[in-house]
Amino acid sequence: IAPMIHVHTAITIFITFTHLIYIFGYLWTKVTIFAFMKTYTSNHIVFFSPTHTSAKIARAIGESIGMGRRIEIDLTTDENSSPIEIKDSITIIAVPVYAGRVAPIALQRLRRLKGNNAPAILVAVYGNRDYEDALVELRDETIQLGFTPLAAGAFIGEHSYSRPNMPIAEGRPDVTDLQIAEQFGKDCLTKLEKDETLSDFYLKGNIPYRFVGPSTPAAPVCTEGCFACGECIEVCPTHAIALSDEGKIETEITKCIKCCACVKECPNGARVFDTPYTPMLHQKCAARREPELFI
């Protein structure tokens, strides 16, 4: 009888131990999931946005996501090279499209970021022509920087070459665009809550990326209405504009990226950029285009 009692006791102990392991495993899983969900209590809004269109979209997405803490990183005029660590934060990264690609200087400044596997919502803003391979390029770059792409969107912003008499996507992003951006942010958050592994998603674009050759150096100029207030100096992303010893505004043409921030921000309307692309884009890109989202 004694051996049978010992066997029964051993079986009971084994079953109890196995049950405890199961309970511990279950509780650990719950704790892990809870910890995962609690990890994202902040969001970073990162943008390069000379004429503020990318910033508007990024902020609309960020505000709809919420979170207890929101941190903005404006790389537009920041030439600092020190690394920026982002950890445990939903990150919105918004950049302008130049000739179907991410603006080169935007890519250059994004390379300061260290993603640490943070989920990233990628945004390309273009002037109503086409974004072509910009989102694919942005995705590849952010993966290299350590981010995990969560979703992506192509939005429309008023073209840098738009003029009052020849508008190109004038006033974009508008109220409708911002509403779409807000809903996009909410949809991204829903995906994050349901899909912890952040599965891949379809993205429009090509590899290799669209070839973009060197552009002819050109820059906006000042008219007689300029009174050297210096506003253009402050907003230039490449610091290509300076005040001469004679008190005149001068532009280093080889540094200009033709973003036309100086044109749009001049309080006296005294900064102009004449380019044959303005009438061409005004004519060919008149039809309204809508945001395209990939989740």
What spans do the regions from the language model cover?
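Short hydrophobic alpha-helical segments enriched in small aliphatic residues
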Residues: V7-T9, L20-G25, A35
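FMN-binding flavodoxin-like domain, especially the glycine-rich phosphate-binding loop
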Residues: T32-H44, S49-T76, S81-S215, D274-I295
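Iron-sulfur cluster-binding cysteine motifs and their immediate structural context
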Residues: C222, F227-E252, A261-T278
